[in-house]
Protein backbone atom coordinates (compact mmCIF):
# COMPACT_ATOMS: atom_id res chain seq x y z
CA UNK A 1 0.00 0.00 0.00
CA UNK A 2 1.55 3.32 -1.01
CA UNK A 3 1.56 6.41 1.19
CA UNK A 4 -0.92 8.03 -1.21
CA UNK A 5 -3.53 5.47 -0.21
CA UNK A 6 -3.36 6.32 3.49
CA UNK A 7 -5.55 8.89 5.16
CA UNK A 8 -3.46 11.59 6.78
CA UNK A 9 -4.40 13.07 10.15
CA UNK A 10 -3.86 16.78 10.69
CA UNK A 11 -3.72 18.18 14.21
CA UNK A 12 -4.12 21.96 14.05
CA UNK A 13 -2.92 22.51 17.62
CA UNK A 14 0.26 20.54 17.03
CA UNK A 15 1.24 22.85 14.17
CA UNK A 16 0.13 26.05 15.89
CA UNK A 17 3.55 26.89 17.31
CA UNK A 18 4.07 29.82 19.61
CA UNK A 19 1.28 31.91 21.01
CA UNK A 20 0.92 35.54 19.96
CA UNK A 21 2.58 36.88 23.11
CA UNK A 22 5.72 34.79 22.65
CA UNK A 23 5.87 35.65 18.97
CA UNK A 24 5.59 39.38 19.64
CA UNK A 25 8.32 39.14 22.28
CA UNK A 26 10.66 37.43 19.81
CA UNK A 27 9.84 39.89 17.03
CA UNK A 28 10.28 42.86 19.39
CA UNK A 29 13.69 41.58 20.49
CA UNK A 30 14.79 40.96 16.90
CA UNK A 31 13.77 44.50 15.92
CA UNK A 32 15.68 45.98 18.86
CA UNK A 33 18.77 43.94 17.99
CA UNK A 34 18.67 45.35 14.46
CA UNK A 35 18.35 48.92 15.79
CA UNK A 36 14.75 49.54 14.74
CA UNK A 37 11.97 51.08 16.83
CA UNK A 38 10.01 47.86 17.55
CA UNK A 39 6.65 49.53 18.21
CA UNK A 40 6.74 51.56 15.00
CA UNK A 41 7.76 48.55 12.92
CA UNK A 42 5.10 46.24 14.39
CA UNK A 43 2.40 48.90 13.95
CA UNK A 44 3.54 49.43 10.36
CA UNK A 45 3.21 45.71 9.70
CA UNK A 46 -0.20 45.44 11.38
CA UNK A 47 -1.63 48.42 9.48
CA UNK A 48 -0.22 47.57 6.06
CA UNK A 49 0.16 43.80 6.07
CA UNK A 50 3.58 44.27 4.47
CA UNK A 51 6.03 41.80 6.08
CA UNK A 52 8.96 44.00 4.97
CA UNK A 53 8.46 45.92 8.24
CA UNK A 54 9.70 42.83 10.09
CA UNK A 55 13.30 41.67 9.56
CA UNK A 56 14.33 38.12 8.81
CA UNK A 57 16.75 38.38 11.74
CA UNK A 58 16.18 35.52 14.22
CA UNK A 59 13.37 34.27 11.93
CA UNK A 60 11.14 37.12 13.16
CA UNK A 61 9.34 37.55 9.84
CA UNK A 62 8.41 33.88 9.55
CA UNK A 63 7.27 33.82 13.18
CA UNK A 64 4.90 36.76 12.84
CA UNK A 65 3.51 35.46 9.55
CA UNK A 66 2.26 32.34 11.36
CA UNK A 67 -0.43 34.51 12.96
CA UNK A 68 -3.19 36.43 11.21
CA UNK A 69 -2.96 40.18 11.73
CA UNK A 70 -6.47 40.33 13.19
CA UNK A 71 -5.49 37.62 15.68
CA UNK A 72 -2.50 39.72 16.81
CA UNK A 73 -4.62 42.88 17.10
CA UNK A 74 -7.28 41.00 19.07
CA UNK A 75 -4.66 39.77 21.55
CA UNK A 76 -3.16 43.26 21.87
CA UNK A 77 -6.58 44.81 22.61
CA UNK A 78 -7.43 42.10 25.15
CA UNK A 79 -4.09 42.58 26.86
CA UNK A 80 -4.39 46.38 26.86
CA UNK A 81 -7.86 46.23 28.37
CA UNK A 82 -6.91 43.48 30.81
CA UNK A 83 -9.44 41.04 29.37
CA UNK A 84 -7.25 37.98 28.76
CA UNK A 85 -10.11 35.51 28.91
Swiss-Prot record:
Q: Where are the transmembrane segments?
A: none
Q: Please, which domain of life does this record's source organism belong to?
A: Bacteria
InterPro entries xrefs: IreB
Which Pfam families does this chain map to? IreB
PANTHER family given in the database record: UPF0297 PROTEIN YRZL
Q: Which family does it belong to?
A: Belongs to the UPF0297 family.
Stored NCBIfam families? PRK05473.1 (NF003997)
Report the protein name in the record.
UPF0297 protein lhv_0439
Q: What is the scientific name of the source organism? A: Lactobacillus helveticus (strain DPC 4571)
Lineage, broadest ranks: Bacteria, Bacillati, Bacillota, Bacilli, Lactobacillales
Amino acid sequence: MSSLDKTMHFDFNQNKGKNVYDTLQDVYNALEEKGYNPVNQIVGYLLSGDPAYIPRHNDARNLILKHERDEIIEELVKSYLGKNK
